[in-house]
Amino acid sequence: MVSKLEILQRFYQIYLEQESDYFIYQEKFYYICRINNFTNDYTYYMNSLNLAGFTIVNNCFNRPVTMDYILYTYQIEDYHLDTFIRQSMIPIQSTVEIIKIKESWCKILDEAKCKIGNYASRISHFEHFVVLSYYYQGLGECAISILNQIKSKEIPAGIEHFYMNDSYEVLCCPSNFVVASRIKDLATGYKNNLITINELEEYISYTNLSTDELIYLYARLLFPGQFMKLAINDDCNDSQVKKRLLSIYQNIDNEKLILIQAYEMLSRYTYIPKIAWL
């Protein structure tokens, strides 16, 4: 398998000492990634935001694609997070099935429970992980239970981000887009403290979300995707992972507060079951 370093050397005459998706070469910013389902729509999407975004660099044969990879160059532009969130809430001609969301969440919880069980005897001294595992398993089960309140089989989809952060390189990254529920970015933005509870309510009013979308929004806020990803994919005995787990543990009170605030706000619009222990 040819590495990215070899591709850059052979097809772009770019010579790096270390492989990285983002890099600077001769004072220019670059990004290299595989082609994906959003590649052909990327330019149209960025134009709709009045941004240049990342621009394709043709290889030495004047072709945009090299062994399923594309090299981009970019310059960081002025942007507003608000523009991306509003764009993400525009429905496209696609929907997301509630049953598939439920199946996905159940699978994640099962995988995490299995992984946590395998670690339990070896990391029993690391109490933060044990406390977090019980807490987030409970939150995840509550989130799935709340999905059962949704009457529709499907909800509108939008162009969302895999990862959400208030950064040009994250928001405009050509490989960071996914078709998902049109409130994915909204939920992640609030959960990551990128927007306030008042701004969350403003977006809800602006978009006129359906009752089922409001219920799903709360369920999505509850579901502990970040912790479960750590539990499933990372070595929980690793020192860096332990630091991240400790950070999550220390932030639990703040996380509870934003969930309580979201519940109080959303329950003014529709009925949502209250979690007694939250």
Predicted region positions:
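ATP-dependent phospho-/nucleotidyl transfer catalytic cores
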Residues: 10, 14-23, 97-160, 198, ...
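ATP/Mg2+ or Mg2+-diphosphate-binding catalytic cores
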Residues: 228-278
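ATP-binding pocket architecture of kinase catalytic cores
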Residues: 25-97
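Central hydrophobic cores of alpha-helical transmembrane segments
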Residues: 216-223
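Active-site acidic catalytic loop and adjacent metal/ATP-binding pocket
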Residues: 22-24, 54, 144-186
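Active-site Asp-x-Gly
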Residues: 168-214
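A glycine-centered beta->alpha junction motif in the catalytic cores
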Residues: 63-79, 111-122, 189, 223-247
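ATP-binding glycine-rich phosphate-binding loop
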Residues: 2-29, 54, 61
